[in-house]
Design a protein with these regions (language model features):
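Metallo-beta-lactamase
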Residues: 56-57, 70, 77-163
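Active-site HxH/HxHxD metal-binding segment of metal-dependent hydrolases
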Residues: 1-70, 161-162
Length: 166
């Protein structure tokens, strides 16, 4: 998910469930067919591309990451949480020391995309229930502004209420 610039990075970590997309992206599996249009390019007139020429470049993962893996960045240690639902290889990153959650696309304070071709509501529910149990203080979602752990629990409870799942 959100991989249009992944080829720019020397290191590309991904969950195995989405590794093939990085290696062989196309308009369907990247959602570019549905979400990328000429208006995006017209907003940047210096850009020499147009929609008809746009392609997400292939660049395979350099490392596969699984639930429970630890990413030690020196001053920050993040635990990988596999949080499928929005997409099958969705991950969140949990920093226990600061009680900070980088939730990606599974949760943010705005309309959640849960009906893409690769979304799965049962997985979504399981992932949200798992996140709700964490002692989160701050959430940095994949979209919109960051929010508190209390707001996270409110958003998750509202999602379950709206879907009548418990």
């Amino acid at each position: 998910d959100h991989i249009a610039g992944h080829h720019e990075f020397d290191e590309r970590l991904v969950h195995p469930a989405e590794a093939e997309i990085l290696a062989a992206p196309d308009g369907a599996n990247t959602l570019a067919t549905d979400f990328v249009g000429d208006d995006m390019f017209e907003a940047h007139p210096d850009c020499p591309l147009c929609y008809a020429e746009y392609r997400v470049r292939a660049a395979p993962a350099t490392r596969l990451i699984e639930d429970g893996d630890v990413l030690d960045l020196g001053n920050r240690v993040l635990q990988v949480l596999h949080t499928p639902g929005h997409s099958p290889g969705g991950i969140s990153l949990w920093e226990a020391r600061t009680q900070t959650l980088f939730s990606g696309d599974i949760l943010y304070d705005g309309p959640l995309i849960e009906d893409a071709y690769h979304s799965n509501l049962e997985d979504y529910a399981h992932s949200l229930a798992r996140l709700r149990e964490l002692p989160v203080r701050t959430v940095h979602g994949g979209h919109f502004a960051s929010f508190s752990g209390q707001r996270m629990r409110e958003l998750i409870d509202a999602w379950f209420d709206a879907h009548r799942l418990t």
